[in-house]
Amino acid sequence: DMWNRCKSDLDYGLYFQEWWEKDVTAMVRKDYNHPSVVLYSVGNEIPEIGTDHGAKTCHDICEKIRSLDDTRFTLASINGVFAAGDKVDQIVADVSADLVEKGELDGNVNDFMTLMDDHMDEIVVHDAISERLEKACASVDIAGYNYMTARYEMDGEKYPNRVIVGSETYPPEIARNWELVKKLAHVIGDFTWTGWDYIGEAGVGVPAYQWGEGGFGAGFPCQLAYSGDIDITGFRRPASYFREVVFGLRKEPYITVQDPNHYGQNLIKTPWVISDSVSTWNWKGCEGKPVVVEIYAPGDEVELFVNGVSQGRKPSGVQAGYRTLFETVYEPGNVTAVAYESGQEMGRMELQSADADAELWAQTEDTKGKELVYIDIALKDKEGRVLTDSDVKLTAEVTGDASAAGFGSGNPKPVYNFNEGVTETFHGRALLILRKTKEGGHGTVTFRAEDGRSATVNY
């Protein structure tokens, strides 16, 4: 993630010259026989990659990799803004002036991060970035573009031999990106940031309604990035279904619901945030209040039903960016979305409100012969529906041949550490990970909620 220029105090940049050849050799040898390895990345968002010295370093790394394995391709994941970091002031001035002239900006924006939120396309096509990319892409087989979708078509025309992949892209832009992947032969795919959520870059994907609650400036207790298609406990988030629909892998629509507690409020979000929606029809205290239902759907039309009453049809699929919004009123019961293609039903999905008297449920995943044991916990009613709007504090009592390695939820703002043995459910779910103390170890785990509910499982 860095070469000679450090990104933070005491990072790998201090040791790069001494270690890069050894580390490249270890990387290639470790995975040489794995057929799933198709690319070797020589660096991600390297600040100096567009300089003469950086271009030489890139060349040296690529040649080292090829000497060890000439069957795979090399890739550099390039952030054009990072590569032209010393030109940021000029880029801001030029882009701002151009937008003011077009009447798209009032002329008061002088902060680069603010400009990036709304005008990344204009920034990444700046000549200063174009100049740096020529050096950055000179030695690699594939040019990885981080957040530079606006360059796909223009660079294909200017550099007909340049093969491009979206090496990091914003989750909300997958519909736009995928249309370009299908259209342009020189753009071979798309990697989102990110697949699985992680600890760090706290708040980058957290939707907020007050400054400091989300985004890069999120304060305590925010710990997770919250930008993953899959949350940190392994459950799919709405963005993963959005992507599945865009890829043409899902014919049924997918229903999510924006939080009605914030209806009409201004959502503060980074480019990694789609919305604050959750796939649930449980919103305690919001009965009779307006709500936005967000549907990801293929086909050309999608229809929404609330408790059996049609809310009308709206365009869906590629013409709507695969994302359709309906305004309605929340009432417990059920919502159903039906996708159509040329008037014929393609698929449907229903969300039902879970009963408030849900029980604590726990299930051990099959991990025989493995050191780690994963136990899913949820608040479920008798029909197996997860109660998402009444989260509870949980404790875990472990007996037998294991100890708790981590106990938590997908909440980006957990109030307990993962090793405390205490957590709160998030949207009705949590996860406990055990580490066995001996091979073939077994025992029991009892989960207790602060309201008296409990569940016991064997491992």
Label the predicted regions.
Residues 324-330, 419-438:
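Short, hydrophobic beta-strand segments
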Residues 36-40, 62-67, 74-370, 382-386:
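Substrate-binding clefts and catalytic carboxylate motifs of secreted carbohydrate-active enzymes
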Residues 300-309, 391-406:
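Extended low-complexity, serine/threonine- and proline-enriched intrinsically disordered segments
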Residues 1-69, 75-78:
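Substrate-binding cleft of carbohydrate-active enzyme catalytic domains
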Residues 342-347, 449-456:
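Short, exposed coil/turn segments at beta-strand boundaries within extracellular/luminal domains
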Residues 314-316, 357-361, 397-413:
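Short aromatic-acidic-glycine turn motif
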Residues 339, 379, 447-449:
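Conserved structural position at the C-terminal beta-strand
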Residues 369-375, 441:
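Short, solvent-exposed loop/turn segments enriched in Ser/Thr/Gly
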